[in-house]
């Protein structure tokens, strides 16, 4: 059943409130842009790249120049967990931090937003989650100010008001939102992304393009989100294969970082689609599955399902043209372009079964998709059922 939406909405909103500094070498100048603060909680992942590549040292040098004290919390895992976020918030409270600085990939960005919220409010993160088994409480106070320094492209968290968080106990992966979760400052320095390994460049880059693919075919598109989405798709499609093949190609890194930022704006003035709901359920059950790879594994079956429902044929044709099929006339040309893109970024050989996914989980996953992030189904042009979602999982499975 199709939901009723306008082809394009000529009204839109824009509440993006982030000071953005984009360009190579910007991290070296961050002290010029940092807001006044007494003590920062620096949040990063439990990996080695931020420290090993010297990014953390550069940040600390700039904090010293600015006269801001700091403490480092470096325990964030991929698909950040509520328990880790609560621990980070406790550190921020104990150390009396008045600003949070995230440096790392999407997990560090999202975890930092959640830490910023919990650090300035009583209780724990899941008290404030509005979906699924969350406590649905309203925060008493605004989140602490956040500075975002992405070292990978992908989530667009440097430009949006949301954060994706996970709970292993409830098997939920959902999101929190709030105007105060926009970073006060985002430093987007493509030089920081040169060290990202090939496969993660591909996974994270696909997350970036997926935000805009979904943002262009959902039911709440507007002329503002369309502008961002098409330019994001063009940049990531044209330059991600180059970044995958040569990580030192700084122009490619810049264009992919720009596309990721634009995709963040798409989510801020529009939204994604239920493809993200399906993936969040998938990686909630299989925590080691990278989010971007989950989207890759689901994308062809998901978009093919919508194309067969003829919910927005012209938009899929337009995307096919932007993705290299200049004479596209059939919506299925988009699937052809998507399949080629998967090959170009070297992700066509991955399978769900590589990560322990089993078909007997699909029914439960489908219910989780609706329960934990059902809001995204409300913006789809087609009214999905649990059975539809199970079918997409099944067709994606290898």
Where are these regions (language model features)?
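C-terminal catalytic subdomain
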Residues: 270-333, 339
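ATP/NTP phosphate-donor binding region
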Residues: 2-99, 352
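Carboxylate- and glycine-rich phosphate/diphosphate-binding segment that chelates Mg2+/Mn2+
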Residues: 161-270
